[in-house]
């Protein structure tokens, strides 16, 4: 974790130093375009690499009861046998993280009255699903909401979305719920890796780095809007 934190701090320090010596155009215009191009090229390369990789046999990732005898109930969305069922399953997975919704956790009960001793128990755990969903959708809305700085005139649907996001009219400038909820979601995902011993044991630098980087982006955005009150339109 500390290595990831050091890298994120180093990135912030380089950006601050570049701005201090008059390289604002490089860090504010050139590098963002380079980053976007690099991102799309990397995604395309990865997709081509995966497409060329040999797949000797099919590895299903379904769950639940497959289609069998008529009197055995099939899990149609978890283990579909039709194209429509596959489309529904993919939609639920991509848009609602259905596999995380089925997440379970294991624990050891020190004394179980039935076994008269320790017993391993399994229970449903929806926290990861909830905060993962909250994180991704808030991040998406924040990303879309920033399009208003690049459009003139601003589309009506974007203005409407912005008004809904700040519907409570708290503070000046008004508080956007997606920014606050995104911060809460990132802190939960980071705390989950820090305080869960088993998860912390298997976590690598590239597990912490995205969370810390996004946390830095969120905190800097909140600071610019509510504390420093930076005029982004002028920038």
Predicted feature locations:
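Juxtamembrane/interface segments at transmembrane-helix termini
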Residues: 21-31, 44-63, 188-205, 223-234
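Alpha-helical transmembrane segments of integral membrane proteins, especially early/N-terminal helices
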Residues: 1-8, 47, 80-93, 128-145, ...
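Transmembrane alpha-helices
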Residues: 1-24, 29-41
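Long, contiguous internal "core" modules enriched in hydrophobic/ aromatic residues
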Residues: 100, 105-235
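Membrane-interface amphipathic/juxtamembrane segments adjacent to transmembrane helices
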Residues: 31-99, 108
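Generic signal for short, ordered secondary-structure residues
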Residues: 26, 69-70, 117, 166
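Structural motif marking the loop-to-transmembrane transition
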Residues: 1-2, 23-30, 80, 84-87, ...
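Alpha-helical transmembrane segments
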Residues: 12, 34-45, 141-144, 181-188
